[in-house]
Amino acid sequence: MRNIMKHGMSKYLFTIFFLFSNSYAFAACQDCVTISGQWVNLSEVGIVVGDYHYGVTKDNKKFLLTDGSVNKAEKALILGTKLYVDT
């Protein structure tokens, strides 16, 4: 019993960490494009639950948002202002 708990618990903790981490090392945005240093107007800000955040420009370019840029993108969308994007 002690041996099962010792090995089972480490696997359990790793699984929990993996599922709930906000790491973008595993992001798989297949249709995202690279936008190099442009000011854009947003039409959408969204999330693929457990995977990544994204933004969509007025000309339908989908791009990956990092953790720190999600709040800025949401504010820009609500206020109708431009967002500087360099992905």
Curated annotation (Swiss-Prot):
Domain of life: Viruses
Name recorded for this polypeptide: Putative protein p8
Organism: Acyrthosiphon pisum secondary endosymbiont phage 1
Gene: 8
